[in-house]
């Protein structure tokens, strides 16, 4: 399975976009990874997520939790491939929680699943909920690790690929200076 080229599959799925994007951080970029485009193609998603499943073979865990929205399908497919239960966390009145009859038991060893990790904010919110319920987060699994060098999560990251996408403050964005309109992708509210 190690011969899978994740970047090529992201491009084939139209998940790796070029243009002018306003990110949820408020920064601008000329590239954006929209993993939802990959996840609409089950066979391609299966291949990419198999790269993560392979990396998790030596990790001791018994449940996977994906934050809604991006982590839900990843959690399901990763659970299917690793033969572990997969559940999701979601926001209720703006607060991340585990509900719908799902539970984390004391002592559960948890992998948090995501589509893209950029700042780690959603993962860390889910980690807090898991730890409050008595679970232990043993890692974060994601399709794309987009973190900058200075972004730390306190947990090991198991990704299908690492993407370095440059971002810019609005005042330093060459695309803004050229009056190229931006697109607001993603699901999180912009700052």
Curated annotation (Swiss-Prot):
Enzyme class: transferase
EC number: 2.4.2.10
Catalytic reaction list: orotidine 5'-phosphate + diphosphate = orotate + 5-phospho-alpha-D-ribose 1-diphosphate
Pathway: Pyrimidine metabolism; UMP biosynthesis via de novo pathway; UMP from orotate: step 1/2
Signal peptide: none
GO-annotated biological processes: 'de novo' UMP biosynthetic process; pyrimidine nucleobase biosynthetic process
UniProt-annotated binding residues for orotate: 118, 146
Cofactor or coenzyme needed: Mg(2+)
Binding site for 5-phospho-alpha-D-ribose 1-diphosphate: 114-122
Function: Catalyzes the transfer of a ribosyl phosphate group from 5-phosphoribose 1-diphosphate to orotate, leading to the formation of orotidine monophosphate (OMP).
Family to which the UniProt record says this protein belongs: Belongs to the purine/pyrimidine phosphoribosyltransferase family. PyrE subfamily.
Subunit organization: Homodimer.
Protein name: Orotate phosphoribosyltransferase
